[in-house]
Amino acid sequence: MMIKIVYITKRGKKIAEEIKDVLDYYHYDNKVEPIKDFKIERNEGGFIFIMATGIVLRKFLDEIKNDKFKDPFVIICNENKELIPILSNHLGGGNYFSKLIANNINGRVIFTTATDVNGKVGIDELSKMLFLETPKRKHILDINKKILEEDVSLTLPKYWKLRNLNGYKISYHDKYEVVVDDSIRLKPLKIAVGLGARKGIERYKVYWAVKKALFLRNIPVWRVDAFATIEDKKHERGILETVNKFKKPLIIFKREEINEIYEKIDLEKSEFVYKHLGVYGVSEPASILAVKKLTNKDFDSIKLILKKFKRNGVTVAIATENL
């Protein structure tokens, strides 16, 4: 997902560079552009404009907005570092990125959505936060209105460790589904973590690499469905002990399965890894294959939400279903 950061003034450029540092740290693809060079390419996941709201509304918004369920987010940031999410705040991640950035540049968020102003979590934001299928339009309107007046029931799979959420009365059941207001059923999307590591890697290095990767995407361990790696690493103690500690299944893939992905998906290739393992990479293709195995979906319905993350001899990638 590409995020474009657009500025006009020298002060705006300085803030844009601060925002870029935050997005780089969290491993989100991003690009800083002066307004004179800025073009909408329609493959962006979000826009951060450091300028007056009126400029964005008049010059760009009509070209960006199209569908509430698919629009990229749009955030306005002024030169006091006040961030205002104005489009696709919940499903597109506008509120999430506003908070993420503000917390890291000593800024503040000005919310305009009723649920957020009142400290509540709307059902659309809930689905984004917990990686659930997207609610229907009618359900978003109904629940987000109701939650402003009273707590809404929320039933979760019993091993999920979410205890408190403002606006909801939480209970648990044995089913692998989330039920909102006793009637709205939302299917959890499968999440898989792909792992690669050098030979003889220590457990603590694998463990902390995984923890950091999950932190970067705000995913609790209990929300992960499976880990995955290549057959060459199936006896690697550092990987086995880490996966066992997290109490999750480990899916093993053959070299041929890993290599097949590179013929179908444009992934980063490492000649160094190919020289030693006979594949161009492990963590990214393993995570994608694991989601495919868990869902039986085609590759077009799967996406990487964290590209290959390297730390202390370990590589980690995270994939999930693409709605």
From Swiss-Prot:
Its EC number is 3.7.1.12. InterPro entries: CbiG_hydrolase (IPR052553), CbiG_N (IPR021744), CobE/GbiG_C (IPR002750), CobE/GbiG_C_sf (IPR036518), GbiG_N_sf (IPR038029). Keywords: Cobalamin biosynthesis, Hydrolase. It is an enzyme of class 3 (hydrolase). It comes from the Archaea. The keyword Hydrolase applies. Disulfide bonds: none annotated. It catalyses: Co-precorrin-5A + H2O = Co-precorrin-5B + acetaldehyde + H(+). The keyword Hydrolase applies. Pfam families: CbiG_C (PF01890), CbiG_N (PF11760). One of its GO terms (biological process) is cobalamin biosynthetic process. Pathway: Cofactor biosynthesis; adenosylcobalamin biosynthesis; cob(II)yrinate a,c-diamide from sirohydrochlorin (anaerobic route): step 5/10. Signal peptide: none annotated. GO terms for molecular function: cobalt-precorrin-5A acetaldehyde-lyase activity. Belongs to the CbiG family. This is Probable cobalt-precorrin-5A hydrolase.
